[in-house]
Regions:
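A contiguous strand-loop segment
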Residues: 3-132, 152-257
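Repeat-unit-sized solenoid/scaffold elements
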Residues: 137, 143, 181-185
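Second-shell loop/turn segments in exported
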Residues: 123-125, 135-142
Length: 257
């Protein structure tokens, strides 16, 4: 196998129930294409429903229905068809569990990232309550490629902010895969999985430095915001080479290094 960059494969947490995602870049896969494997772990009695949602045109002014307290996103004029793996517990759906493959071959799965330091009491870090389930739905409905999905994710998070405390998203197609790890609000770290790499997404933040991978994505204030909140202090003033996203944004008792 080709050289694999040092993606963090460390501890998966202290509980016996953990989602996990494995990603193989196309040069690391025997198929010559990206491979994604995902295990969804949710407690209690869960019904898993599978179905196809056809493409659709929407009237001007349509919005995406959302969980109570979350933002109602404007719907786009046309949405793609997608295969939907839906997890339902009792009579309710699970906002952070469902997976998708759309008609363009874009895959969306996610993992819990435990708790971020951004508290749920900080309503100012999101707009109109922020976005939760509709992030994954919007990706399924709109992404023409995995790279397009990465763009959509960042645009939605930049505008609305992410409502839950911590979550990771994998967005992949046959040629590329992207990992994003989101804190509550508008702060995240993302990376394209190198073609010759095998990557693991556990249940805690494991993206670290600003230049660890050939392609990385983060908001312009990801460092300065952490400094302002007291979550990160550079060893040398003005030098952010020791910045660690996972350490800065993960709740201290859930940081595994």
């Amino acid at each position: 196998m080709a050289n694999t960059p040092a993606f963090d494969l460390d501890a998966f947490g202290n509980t016996p129930m953990n989602c996990m995602t494995l990603i193989a870049g196309k040069a690391a896969s025997a198929t010559g294409h990206v491979l994604v494997g995902h295990n969804e772990d949710d407690g209690g009695h869960v019904v898993v429903r599978h179905g196809w949602v056809p493409p659709r045109d929407w009237e001007k002014g349509a919005v995406m229905p959302a969980e109570d307290g979350c933002a109602l996103l404007p719907q786009v004029a046309h949405t793609l068809g997608y295969y939907w793996v839906e997890y339902r517990k009792d009579v309710m759906g699970l906002s952070n569990a469902d997976g998708f493959v759309n008609e363009r071959g874009v895959v969306i799965v996610s993992n819990s990232m435990g708790t971020s330091r951004e508290g749920m009491e900080n309503a100012d870090c999101v707009k109109d309550g922020g976005i939760a389930f509709n992030l994954r739905r919007a990706l399924a409905e709109r992404a023409q490629t995995a790279r397009d999905g990465a763009r959509i994710l960042m645009e939605l998070i930049d505008e609305w902010g992410y409502a839950p405390s911590g979550r990771a998203y994998t967005i992949a197609d046959r040629d590329e895969a992207f990992m994003f790890q989101l804190a509550r609000g508008r702060h995240y770290m993302g990376a394209r999985v190198p073609d010759d790499a095998i990557a693991v997404m556990p249940n805690h933040f494991n993206l670290h430095g600003l230049t660890d991978y050939p392609e990385q994505f983060y908001p312009a204030d990801v460092v300065t915001y952490a400094i302002a909140r007291g979550w990160y202090t550079p060893a040398k003033n003005g030098d952010f080479s020791d910045f660690d996203f996972a350490k800065a944004y993960q709740a201290e008792d859930e940081f595994f290094g």
